[in-house]
Every structure is written in structure tokens, then in C-alpha cells.
Amino acid sequence: MATNNDFGAFIEKVTISPTSTSSSPPSLQGLTFAIKDIFDVEGRVTGFGNPDWLRTHSAATSTAPVVSSLLEAGATALGITIMDEMAYSINGENAHYGTPRNPIAFDRVPGGSSSGSAVAVAARLVDFSIGTDTGGSVRVPASYCGIFGFRPSHGAVSTVGLTPMAQSFDTVGWFARDTATLKRVGCVLLQQHHLNPIEPSQLIIADDCFKLCSVPHDLLVQPLVGSVEKSFGGNTVVKKVNLGEYIGQNVPSLKHFMTSDDVTTQQEFCIPSLMALSSSMRLLQRHEFKINHGAWISSVKPEFGPGISERIEEAIRTSDEKIDHCRSVKSELITALSTLLGEKGVLVIPTVPGPPPHLQANVAALESFRSRAFSLLSIAGVSGFCQVSIPLGLHENLPVSVSLVAKYGSDGFLLSLVDSLAAFI
């Protein structure tokens, strides 16, 4: 159970010492980290955010390779963090174990599902932490808690030893308060030990996406554009694109997910092609979640909290219809975005539609925010491209952020880029 003196971040406090045997100083020596309760640690039951899951599963017989690699690199783990049940929320509220307290905005949600991991970093309880990001579970809490969050290219970091949510989207991500630590951790997890700064060929600002966001456009975009100019001397091409229009024209399989609601919803709250992209992503997530956990749910009949329960019921009812179309959307989107970005282009989008919502917010208002959030989160989610959420301080006393997205496999480039820009943002 979470305790009061740690912002409610931890489900269990336990020190796991480094295992490095190298004669030279390991790369993460002296750093501490926290582990989301989705990763196996030998000898303990992985809780997956739900007491019934904890009760009906056995202790892990081995530790997830991603955790082992961090320990081998010299880092010390200080505990296991709270997460949203079954990783099925981006809100950060857990009806069973309590909601980790957002250190930057006490009356706002911390974001999920990697809520405790983000809070532990933001509250300076650890130097970095690991989480997972399926539909936004690293990017969202990073934004809400005012820290850096990195979602790698899908498959770039091993997912062995973590409880799956939806394998087509599951990634291992990490949080840090500064880009130097973010990069150091990335070098270990990505097994890339020499990441030199590379100038981006173009900075592509998805102008229409910023209309989904309540934070003023210039407040998010100008610091980034200015930092690129200062870092690289103004050689990077900066251009704007209507991303929704581009995706709509170049991902034809999205037609299977377009609805009349997408077209008639007010423009400031909806980009039809991105709504369709979000629908495709969430359908395939539900399908894979059902395959992974449907039998356990039917057998155990676990108790789920509000919001989670309804989402899981919907997943259990999901049919196989349109699943092939989901996979076509993914393939077409990868091609379309690869063409748009070129070799070293970077896409600029809001991480989320605005500052973190209030705790126990109105359900209808929260659903509108969630819908716009998934329009943004599905871009990297479906394509499998890497994305970093960059904190930009406070707006009206609440944390705000912007994101950079780079093509599949460009993780090292993106980590080095954000590290180069940090001094000027």
C-alpha cells in the first residue's frame, strides 16, 4: 500500500543493489530508479495495479531484462511504483491503492498508467524511473508531472518480463528530470553507447494539432524553434504542415474508421483523420487485451475501479471485425510519416491537449479531453515511431509540454537532439 511520505508513488519500497561486475565505473553508477509494477522482479508477484491480479498470480522466477540491464549498469532500485489497473488508463487514479500525488499540481491527476513512476521522479525520490507506454502511459504522466518522458520505437527495448497490455503497441519508456539522465538511461536500454548530436534536417510543426490544445500555440512552439536555431545555427528547415489532412490523404484504410461524428464535431476539438487513427489504435488494443487477459477476467471476475471497469467490459465484447484494417492503417501510416519526415526530420506536436485535469473530474469533460489526447497519442502509438515529451515549465501555474516525434529506429538521434536543445529551451 502507498505511504504518505512518498507522494503515494510506491506500492512497495525495496532496495535492489547494483549487480555490475565491471572493473571500470558503470554508466549509471550513483543513480537511483523506480520500477513500475508491471515488470517482473525475481521473488515478488507483479501486481499489475490490481489486488485480484496480485492474489491470483505467483512470484516471478526471474527479473525482466530491462530491470537487470539497469542494475548491471550500476543503478540502484528503490522501489516498485503504483500504476493504473491493468495499464488501462492515462489518468493515474487507482481505486484500490490510491492515486499518486502530482508534485507539481496537487489538485490534478498525475497521469497514467505509469503514474507512480512519473511522480517518483517529479518528487525527486529517484533520479529516473521506468514505465510502459502502450497508448500514452509514459508521455501523458511525463507531461502532467513536468518531467521528460521517452517512448522508444516499438520493439527497440525488450518487453520480456513485463505483463503485456497490447503487444502491437507496448513499449518500455523512461522518465527523468533532465536530458543528461534521460540520455544516459537511453544509452543503456537502447544499447547505444555513443550518441553524438546530429542536426535535424527539418522541424515540421503540425499546426492543426495545436488547435486541439488549450495552451497557446506560441507558448509551446516558439521555445522549441528558438532552441533549434540557437543549437544548430539556423540551418534546420522549419515548416508547417496540416498533419490531419496529410494523414487523411495518405492512409486510405482510415476510411474504415471514419464516422459521421468525426465530421460533425466542432473543428477545435476534432481532426477527423486523427480521430479515426485513434479509433483504429484503441480497437486493436482492445482486441489484444482480450486475447491476453480475457480468460483470467472470466475466471476470476476481478473487481475494477470506475472507468477501468467499463473499458475492460468493452474490450471483452470486442469482435475480430476490422482487425485486418487496423494493421493496414499501421503499415500505411509508417510509410506516410517516413516520407514526411525524411531521414532526419522531426515532427512537433502537443503531447496532450492541455494541463492535467482535476482529480475526480467530470466524466463527460474528461472523456472529451481523453478523446483529443488519443488523437495526438495515436500518431506515435500506431506508427511505432519514437517520441519524447519535453516539459516547458508552467502556464497558469500548471505544467505544460511539447513533443518531438522521429521516425522508427531514430531513438539515439532523438535523445541526442533533445539533449542538445535542453540548454536553450
Swiss-Prot record:
Reactions the enzyme catalyzes: a monocarboxylic acid amide + H2O = a monocarboxylate + NH4(+); indole-3-acetamide + H2O = (indol-3-yl)acetate + NH4(+); 2-phenylacetamide + H2O = 2-phenylacetate + NH4(+); L-asparagine + H2O = L-aspartate + NH4(+)
Thermal effects: Optimum temperature is 35-37 degrees Celsius. Optimum temperature is 37 degrees Celsius.
pH dependence: Optimum pH is 7.0. Optimum pH is 7.5.
Modification N-acetylalanine occurs at: 2
Result of altering residue 113 to A/T: Loss of catalytic activity
One GO MF term attached to the UniProt entry: hydrolase activity, acting on carbon-nitrogen (but not peptide) bonds
Main location: cytoplasm
InterPro entries reported for this sequence: Amidase_CS (IPR020556), Amidase_dom (IPR023631), AS_sf (IPR036928)
Name of the protein this chain belongs to: Amidase 1
Biological source species: Arabidopsis thaliana (Mouse-ear cress)
Name of the encoding gene: AMI1
